[in-house]
Regions:
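Basic, Lys/Arg-rich alpha-helical nucleic-acid-recognition elements, primarily the DNA-binding modules
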Residues: 1-72
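Residue-level marker of regulatory loop/turn positions in helix-turn-helix DNA-binding domains and
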Residues: 5-6, 78, 82, 173
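Short, well-ordered beta-strand micro-motif
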Residues: 69, 205-207
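Short, charged/polar, Gly/Pro-enriched secondary-structure boundary elements
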Residues: 73-78, 163-165, 209
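Mid-protein regulatory/catalytic core that forms ligand/cofactor-binding pockets
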Residues: 98-205
């Protein structure tokens, strides 16, 4: 397969695995034209970074050999158009049944997430809840960090929004996130900046109720 010359070795390996499936060190070495030691070094780094995983495959003759394939994390590096499909479906739903129907879908998603995570908050004080919420949001791709202010309030900052295209069109998604945080934290939550409203990040100020 012809590959762009300006791709890094790591990206070339990822692209090879995407198009060919799991590959052995020998197969990668043959396609890249570099030493096996260099390939193993790249594979080791990529495996530590969670981009690839190895498994042993039996051969017709000889000992089993290790092959390397993409993880779900690596699959996420390749372009996807899920938000376009989702927006198209939501727009069709809105045209057919009205905006309230779309809003109810966001409400149901909020309730589902609340049920999913409420057990994580049991027995925790507010700081621990905020820290756990930041972990949850990070796991979902929001690039979240939290800070404690001198007045005892907390600030939760989300530097990325995986559903930004949807939130830009349907602001009710943002309102549901705010209500979800209030429910999980059992606290007063105020959003002072929002990516969907031309902010650089989403910022939530959290106060004890």
């Amino acid at each position: 397969m012809n590959q762009p010359k300006d791709l890094s070795t790591r990206d070339r390996i990822l692209q090879m695995m995407k198009t060919s499936g799991p590959l052995s060190t020998k197969e990668i070495t043959g396609q890249l034209g570099i030493t096996e030691m260099a390939v193993r070094r790249h594979l080791g780094t990529m495996e530590r970074d969670g981009l690839i995983e190895s498994k042993m495959v039996r051969q017709t003759l000889g000992r089993p050999t290790a092959v390397y394939g993409l993880t779900e994390l690596a699959e996420g590096l390749f372009p996807k158009k899920y938000h376009t499909l989702t927006l198209d479906l939501l727009d069709e739903l809105e045209q057919e049944y009205g905006e309230e129907t779309v809003n109810r879908l966001f409400d149901r998603r909020k309730d589902k997430l609340n049920r999913q995570y409420e057990a994580d908050m049991q027995g925790k004080d507010l700081l621990e809840k905020v820290q756990r919420l930041a972990e949850i949001q990070n796991e979902n791709g929001y690039m979240t960090e939290c800070e404690t202010q001198e007045n005892g309030h907390f600030v939760l900052m989300e530097h990325n929004c995986p559903i930004s295209q949807i939130a830009n069109r349907y602001n009710h998604a943002c309102e549901c996130e705010l209500k979800l945080f209030e429910s999980l934290l059992d606290a007063k939550v105020e959003r002072t900046e929002c990516l969907a409203q031309e902010g650089r990040k989403c910022v939530y100020v959290i106060k004890p109720s």
